[in-house]
From Swiss-Prot:
One of its GO terms (cellular component) is cytosolic large ribosomal subunit. Part of the 50S ribosomal subunit. This is Large ribosomal subunit protein uL13. Belongs to the universal ribosomal protein uL13 family. One of its GO terms (molecular function) is mRNA binding. Keywords: Ribonucleoprotein, Ribosomal protein. One of its GO terms (biological process) is translation. This protein is one of the early assembly proteins of the 50S ribosomal subunit, although it is not seen to bind rRNA by itself. It is important during the early stages of 50S assembly. It comes from Natronomonas pharaonis (strain ATCC 35678 / DSM 2160 / CIP 103997 / JCM 8858 / NBRC 14720 / NCIMB 2260 / Gabara). It comes from the Archaea. InterPro entries: Ribosomal_uL13, Ribosomal_uL13_bac-type, Ribosomal_uL13_CS, Ribosomal_uL13_euk/arc, Ribosomal_uL13_sf.
Amino acid sequence: MSYAEFDADVVIDARDCILGRVASQVAERALDGERIAVVNAEQAVITGSEDDIMEVYRKRDEVGSDRGPRYPKRPDRIFKRSVRGMLPYKTTRGREAFENVRIYMGNPYEEAEVLEDTSLDRLSNIKFVSLGEVSENLGANVTW
């Protein structure tokens, strides 16, 4: 499905927003039946020290066999997997909600809203890593 074919009810900008907070609100709204597009996924952030975050993602990448489980490396796919983890994905309702969510690197839409209480400004500490940096360290091809 191309950018033009997805008619989103809501376009959310994830730039400098905390991944988990945005993902939980996206999941909740998708369950309510809204069609949601999230833009600038590569600029969303994960809080914590860079070493700790990268250790978690590297362990995830090393565990398993050639047959799986496989984990995403691209920022948009990491974001989408986070949203999926917050949905009852194995039920019909959850799967339909998941189909109504699109995640984009960059911004193919004219305007986007920023969700309340998801901004990086609310942090008392300054330790965070962007999804783009995580993806680069995992070996993703940098196209953003």
